[in-house]
Amino acid sequence: MIKMRVRFPTLVLLLGIVFLMAVSIGIAYGEKNVIKNHERPQEREQEERDPRQQPRPHHQEEQEREHRREEERDREPSRGRRESEESREEEREQRREPRREREQEQQPQHGRREEEEEWQPRRQRPQSRREEREQEQGSSSSSRRQSAYERREQREEREQEQEQGSRSDSRRQRNPYYFSSERFQTLYRNRNGQIRVLERFDKRTDRLENLQNYRIVEFQSKPNTLILPKHSDADYILVVLNGSATITIVNPDKRQSYNLENGDALRLPAGTTSYILNPDDNQNLRVVKLAIPINNPGNFYDFYPSSSKDQQSYFSGFSRNTLEATFNTRYEEIQRILLGNEDEQEDDEQRHGQEQSHQDEGVIVRVSKEQVQELRKYAQSSSRKGKPSKSGPFNLRSNKPIYSNKFGNFYEITPNRNPQAQDLDISLTFIEINEGALLLPHYNSKAIFVVLVDEGEGNYELVGIRDQQRQQDEQEVRRYSARLSEGDIFVIPAGHPISINASSNFRLLGFGINADENQRNFLAGFEDNVIRQLDREVKGLTFPGFAEDVERLIKNQQQSYFANAQPQQQQQREREGRHGRRGHIFSILSTLY
């Protein structure tokens, strides 16, 4: 046990000596490799290029190791100098490393700083623009009004672009006062014509709630056709917009027929049985009616005595016993003659072939020329001069226009001038605007106008309030506009300023509702201009400019009611442009000749 204790320290000492020798040998071998690599770089590169070289034998490696030791002993005097140089080089390298680390740490910061400097102007640009805009807005009250107006113009232009690119549903939400011709719903249609009705006004917006009991109906028929007799639970005011017609009104004690031409109008009381003939051989008939339902607001029904594929006879709603007692005839006979019998014999079909074909056609049927002549034999023409009668038709252009100049004509029949429209409180207007002309801005004091495009194309601008539920000081003005074409309809609420621009010869038909004592107030023009009638002092207090400047501006427009839609400045620029081009051409010709 004592011997083991003595040998253990000795063993540890020997192991330490061996470890130190191994370390010294490894260091010497590493330095030898460094020297060898400096002296023989070509051999090293060759070894790296050929990694597939076979490993050398162990005794050969031992010989090479001995050879290296001998060379190291031969170079022993210069080894100290080399080690000192290497130590100095290591010190220099140690001093360089902290500097490199600092540079590497600073390099990303410089990159980020450069990126921040690069992005900083971009962030500052909007801020500088806002500051400049605020400075410009703060320069004067007029510039503030102008910038607010420009912002509103830009917003409304974006809304109009979205309106033109969107579908009809989204467009309806932005402009509830405009109804395209696609908003009509077809009631009846066959090869001879069609009857359709516009959707309800109050379904579009609450702002048209007062129009819930008014509907627009349109029917068209081909030449030599007849719309079968019917009556309705609504009052009608009908207007012929295209072609000619013969309408027959049937009362319990008499029957009256009238020949109607383009522009003729007629009141058709509720419950009156009537039928309309298109007697022309070539021209289609187009009639528009304003319907005022009696029983249910916004809903009306047509009642036909005949049965066809489109509707049933109102006789079919009675019981068999009631019909037999009413006509004092067997039910089978009533069914065969009035209602139609599906079990008719073949000889009966041949005998009544014409009546059967009319049932197959529907509501609008064809008639022969002989039948046309018979139906028009006792018809009267409309009254084109003098006061309208209490029951007969009247023409919208029978009297002189109330507004007229070289740019357009404005015809109107008011309730106090027409007994047929007096109890309905309806007025009728017919407007003709020449191509390139403008109906100057105006508003109606109490009447709501429903306007239909009869012919041509144009556009309108209606000024309203964006949110009518806000307080007065928070209300914001909005412009509602739309491109108009034939068949389109738009509504002009009372008090809302409007202007209409014609891009082609434009014809409009208007129904004025709540029209009694309505007054039309123009906002520009020489006559009937309410702005012109303001006191001079009030003009200066109302507008940003001085009173004399306001008066001079108002007097610039010498026309009344209708004017040229092209601004005077633009016309002058175009004239100058044409004159400039002409002078340029003359100068070129003068150099040539």
UniProtKB/Swiss-Prot annotation:
Q: What is the lineage of its organism?
A: Eukaryota, Viridiplantae, Streptophyta, Embryophyta, Tracheophyta
Keywords (alphabetical) are: Allergen, Glycoprotein, Seed storage protein, Signal, Storage protein
The UniProt entry, under SUPFAM superfamilies, shows: RmlC-like cupins
Which positions are glycosylated? 242, 501
Q: Spell out the residue ranges making up region: Disordered.
A: 38-178, 343-365, 377-399
Any miscellaneous information on file? The variability of the residues taking part of IgE-binding epitopes might be responsible of the difference in cross-reactivity among legumes.
Which spans are transmembrane here? none
Q: Which Pfam families match?
A: Cupin_1
To which species is this protein native?
Lupinus angustifolius
Q: Listed GO molecular functions? A: nutrient reservoir activity
Superkingdom, according to UniProt? Eukaryota
**Residue spans with biased composition (Basic and acidic residues)?**
38-105, 147-158, 349-365
| Every Cupin type-1 domain range | 177-335, 394-551
Name of the protein in question: Conglutin beta 6
Quote the biased-composition stretches of kind Low complexity, using this chain's numbering: 137-146
Q: How does it assemble?
A: Component of globulins complexes which accumulate in seeds.
List, alphabetically, the InterPro entries matched. Cupin_1, RmlC-like_jellyroll, RmlC_Cupin_sf, Seed_Storage-Functional
The role this protein plays is: Seed storage protein. Accumulates during seed development and is hydrolyzed after germination to provide a carbon and nitrogen source for the developing seedling.
